[in-house]
Amino acid sequence: MALYGNFGQTNYVATKAGLIGMTKTMARELGKKGVTVNAVAPGFILTDMVRKMPEEVLKSMEDKVPVKRLGKPEEIAAAYAFLASDDAAYINGTVISVDGGMTV
């Protein structure tokens, strides 16, 4: 939500935006030591907590996502695994949105 905001969630969105700022600052500070710092920004993910929501709420969430479904925890894990791999060695200070296109 740090990338697009949401009504009634000022505190939550502000903390997420703070994490993005921290990520970018740490990337600059630690990059010279060979340390990369990145963030993953998940969209609506089908977690145990989300599964307990009423069906109409889940449908509303799906309707907001361009790919018309909620993400899976494994898809978030895959982004983290990529960032931890050698394939991402030159990626630094980046936020990867794993959100089905919500931030497009």
Regions found by a protein language model. Name each.
Residues 1-9, 31:
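Active-site "substrate specificity/gating" loop of NAD(P)-dependent dehydrogenases
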Residues 1-4, 26, 102:
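Active-site segment of SDR-like NAD(P)-dependent oxidoreductases
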Residues 3, 20, 41-52:
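Short, flexible catalytic-loop segment of classical short-chain dehydrogenase/reductase
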Residues 15, 23:
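Active-site helix of classical SDR
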Residues 30-32, 45, 71, 84:
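A short hydrophobic alpha-helix cap/turn motif
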Residues 31, 36, 91-93:
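Short, small/polar-rich loop/turn modules that mediate ligand/substrate recognition or access, typified
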Residues 39, 62-87, 91, 100:
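C-terminal helical subdomain
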Residues 51-65:
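A short C-terminal helix-loop "cap" of Rossmann-like NAD(P)-dependent dehydrogenase/epimerase domains
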